């Protein structure tokens, strides 16, 4: 793995700003104009990339397979249509691709997509600077290897997977192409606040220890900013969240998506966090230099002292402020018993040059 790669002109990874992906996914609701508007809004809200999904219902789901499960499960239980029909409605016509790419270019935002078949990987390749692989394909090594072979950066989400799944995909794919980002992800799309307890953001810490040079990320489906801020503080350099114009719209992804307003807030809070993380070295910061003088204490004499006086503890007070040429209190035992080489006025600081 490598610590940095470029998506277009933007450097991603170590010592770089967080890269934000607005996952439009199915929130275009089958309407090209809405898709184009979402790109524009995502760019204005501060996203680095607008991501779509390239699939046809026939190449991603089995109508028979889902119907044979009986009842639709999890978030799909609320769908009024069959799984096959929902995916059919959410699919992107291939002739949209160039239009989406052009709109992204026009708005200075990167065009990304997740292709869900080998053929679609080849189709979208000319339009992409990087690939995104959804969590559901983490065990489809064939498509991951094919994407990795393109030589471009690729981002893999790890929702609904275990340690072995993640280890397998990292070891497999990184041998082909080391420009890889692994995203912690929880793939529950119910928009329930109960989902926070399943995010397991500390897995990022585990990955960081196990693969020190691996670029980490978070693909998130919870409300608010806390999960994103937590992930960034734990080392995530790529953040993906769904993006919509309104959470009140009907569709599979709108309820847990970010709006332009909440996206802008997320970017602002994230920049504040990034600025506050620092380099990990404890030091007196530039904006604290005056505070050292104001709040630290110095050693002062509490009476008028004559030259050749031998200092006793009772001669001294420990008081603010602490001028740069003063002696700080940690040295008090070094001063007691020393001889004063000049007269000192009450309340004056002691300086090293005052002592023999």
What kind of region is each of these model predictions?
Residues 1-356:
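Catalytic cores and adjacent flexible loops of soluble metabolic enzymes
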């Amino acid at each position: 793995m490598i610590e940095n790669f470029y998506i277009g002109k933007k450097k991603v990874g170590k010592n770089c700003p967080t890269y934000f992906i607005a996952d439009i996914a199915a929130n275009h609701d089958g309407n090209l104009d809405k898709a184009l508007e979402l790109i524009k809004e995502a760019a204005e809200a501060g996203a680095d990339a607008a991501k779509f999904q390239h699939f046809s219902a026939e190449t991603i789901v089995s109508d028979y397979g889902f119907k044979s499960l009986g009842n639709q499960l999890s978030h799909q239980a609320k769908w009024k249509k069959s799984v096959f029909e929902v995916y059919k409605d959410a699919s992107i016509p291939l002739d949209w691709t160039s239009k989406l790419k052009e709109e992204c270019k026009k708005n200075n935002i990167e065009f990304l997509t997740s292709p869900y078949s080998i053929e679609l990987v080849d189709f979208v390749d000319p339009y992409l600077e990087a690939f995104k692989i959804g969590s559901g394909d983490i065990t489809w090594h064939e498509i991951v290897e094919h994407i990795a072979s393109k030589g471009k950066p690729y981002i893999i989400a790890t929702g609904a997977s275990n340690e072995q799944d993640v280890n397998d995909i990292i070891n497999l794919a990184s041998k082909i192409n080391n420009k890889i980002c692994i995203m912690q992800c929880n793939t529950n799309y119910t928009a329930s606040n109960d989902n926070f307890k399943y995010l397991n953001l500390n897995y990022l810490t585990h990955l960081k220890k196990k693969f020190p040079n691996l670029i980490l990320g978070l693909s998130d489906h919870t409300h608010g900013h806390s999960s994103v801020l937590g992930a960034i503080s734990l080392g995530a350099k790529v953040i993906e969240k769904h993006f919509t114009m309104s959470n009140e719209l009907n569709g599979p992804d709108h309820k847990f998506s970010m709006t332009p307003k909440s996206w802008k807030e997320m970017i602002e809070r994230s920049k504040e966090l990034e600025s506050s993380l620092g380099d990990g070295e404890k030091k007196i910061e530039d904006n604290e230099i005056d505070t050292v003088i104001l709040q630290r204490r110095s050693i002062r004499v509490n009476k008028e002292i004559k030259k050749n006086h031998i200092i006793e503890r009772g001669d001294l007070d420990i008081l603010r402020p602490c001028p740069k040429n003063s002696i700080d209190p940690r040295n008090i035992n070094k001063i007691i018993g020393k001889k004063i080489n000049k007269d000192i006025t009450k309340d004056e600081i002691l300086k090293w040059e005052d002592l023999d």
